[in-house]
């Protein structure tokens, strides 16, 4: 009888120990992705693919072969992604390279670090343009045109560089000459949250050389910027998009380039990741970081 009791106790302790190990074991990856309509999400999903299927195909319901992982977060801003990743050791997400600070760690992708050189020569694959959107029919108010001219000038390029963004090599910046206005003008810019920091800086610099134009800023996301330009028949709105999505409603004008950085918590030992591994993480085929060699 005593022997039976000893065996039962030993068995219970073994089960309890296994359960404790399980509770304290490695947790699943917390997948962080931007909300639908985000230019950052569009740029990321166009590139991340497997077997000819992109994450964008999943977003647009063009495939039933794969689906997104169930356990995920979809914050509506760059700051939201950074907050989640910086506070969770098991999180992974993606943000504008210019937004990466000490609170998150950017991974190399396929062994390539996101830099000015690797973006301009195309070696770093997850990249996108920062676009200024104007009406396709050419309608634009003089004040909106003046702000557009400033943004495309050599003066603006200095501020773009200071934000860690990348000069678009196929465009030669011009010289800005402020237009003259007899009365105070007001224009609107609307769109990508990823472009908020650089555009706020450009608006501030513009105000110092053009005191007669007030620029009202709104950042509802890239899709919101596209809609704002389409809906403003007067051409007094300049849209902001952080991914290309051609349309007959607007013209895309490249302000600069940006890398979409894949980020993890600084405590994560992972340093490199492949496109295929990213696809598997975002579709749930890979659930733990220990399944990745990087």
Stretches found by the model and what they are:
Residues 19, 24-294:
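Exported/periplasmic ABC-transporter solute-binding proteins
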